[in-house]
Amino acid sequence: MVRAAVLPAVGAPLEITEIDLPDPGPGQVRVRLAAAGVCHSDLSLSNGTMRVPVPAVLGHEGSGTVLAVGEGVAHLAPGDDVVLNWAPSCGSCHACSLGEVWLCVDALSGSADVYARTAAGVDLHPGLNVAAFAEETVVAASCVLPLPDGVPLADAALLGCAVLTGYGAVHHSARVRAGETVAVFGAGGVGLATLQAARIAGASTVVAVDVSPEKEDLARAAGATDFVVASADTAREIRALTGKQGVDVAVECVGRASTIRAAWDSTRRGGRTTVVGIGGKDQQVTFNALEIFHWGRTLSGCVYGNSDPARDLPVLAEHVRAGRLDLGALVTERIALEGIPAAFANMLAGKGGRALVTF
């Protein structure tokens, strides 16, 4: 039996309880978690903005050590340090055939499986495939990537979602070039990773935007050259910082209609806006036909940073080893499983960066 944070039903409080994990079957791996990041996607799953079968063990941003492998698993062995890959690609759908593995239609199919049971015998599903809010997990081997050398094991959890997403938004989706100007809306875990990625890309001006003035120090440490407290005048303030032109690129990491609109308005004519934040269906963004034509701007969605974890993890590890990417700087609190509800509340209040559950 291992301890886990169980979501019994959508909208219900998490329950910290013991669960019964089976031994890994063919093609499966058992992992002892070192850490798991608390992501806004976990909050979205708990409140029903996103849907997975319940009851479920949430948590998708994790790192740990292999305890056992099932039959047929050849690329991993007990004792290996690993990062969990919550969105493994199938390799055969249309998106995968185009090389767009981040859009794989079957990536989350494992979330419907029963992977464990409560002490009372209730079936449990692995939220977003990997069920990282637990001391241990059993996952498909495709959900496990070897951790490159030189990356701290606990902090490596952030590579599984926040960093892949933020780095990919800058380098794969928006394709920021050296010397360009960038605005990042939202300075939570993904936003802070995006700021670091913009700095790595060589952006000349990096503006962080957040509702919380107390995040300025965090944002500047991550690479922001300027900080703007979000308001109705945000776009005007950003244009003032960029010679009245607006930024080349805006990355929205919040998922609200108002911030998507502000991000669009903050870009120059011909600028690019990338939306990373997950918003609800009730968040309606309005544009008129003339402005779409006249401004010549581009608006694009960005799923998981348009990243291929197997391809990008070694690149990110090299940035960590070279000191260009500081994983620890993204973490504003290290908590136990019992601290997850408070971490969710802090997200809703716009407080802090990434909370990291450590085991």
Language-model features, listed with the residues they occupy:
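C-terminal hydrophobic helical "lid"/dimerization subdomain
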Residues: 2, 261-265, 306, 310-359
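Local beta-strand N-terminus motif with an aromatic residue
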Residues: 79, 179, 224, 246-247, ...
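Glycine-rich beta-strand-centered segment in the early N-terminal region that forms part
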Residues: 22-36, 49-97, 102, 143, ...
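Cysteine-cluster motifs in flexible loop/terminal segments that predominantly coordinate metals
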Residues: 86-142
